[in-house]
Amino acid sequence: MPRIQVTPPPPEHSSHPQLVGDLRRELADSREFGQPLIIEEPFARTEERRVTVVWDRFARLDHEERTLVILDAYDQDQQGALPRIAVALGYTFPEGEDEGVLPYEVAPNLRSGDVVTAEQCHQAMIQLGASVLRDPQRPSLSLPTAELAKKYVDRLIAILPQSREVWTIYGNMRGACNLTFTSSARISG
């Protein structure tokens, strides 16, 4: 059987340099909370990895352009890292929820008599990067792991100390993946 080796076309680059630069800065100076959420999953037998970036700023970009933003940002951040990325996926938070990438949701479960208000809870969630794309009146704080969801609850309690009893972590096991939180908002498998 013939063996065919295909020469790849020259690489394309993103037409959104501002997003590329912002994502590159996030890669260099990862924050503990907020957007974007960067998930890096290595493949078992290679040094290649799948990179998923969940970021509401992708809302107006098609999937191909999102991939170019991710690849260009990694290329600028770490020379030589680009060939190690086998798959680069970009989602908004609602898309990540729908695709099962973010199976855990942190939400307030307010009761009458609670000291904190829904508005205070929503503002604290937005401060930590909750998405308002799906519903501006109900921020969504979805995450890839239960461990990371717990870390977000701890931070929400630090922001609103009287909210300790209102936070609930909901799990949708449909898309739960085996990821481990390592540091800041960057996840590694």
Residue ranges of model-derived segments:
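Short, low-order "capping/linker" segments at domain edges
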Residues: 94-103, 148-157, 175-189
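N-terminal presequence-like segments and adjacent domain-start helices
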Residues: 1-20, 99-110
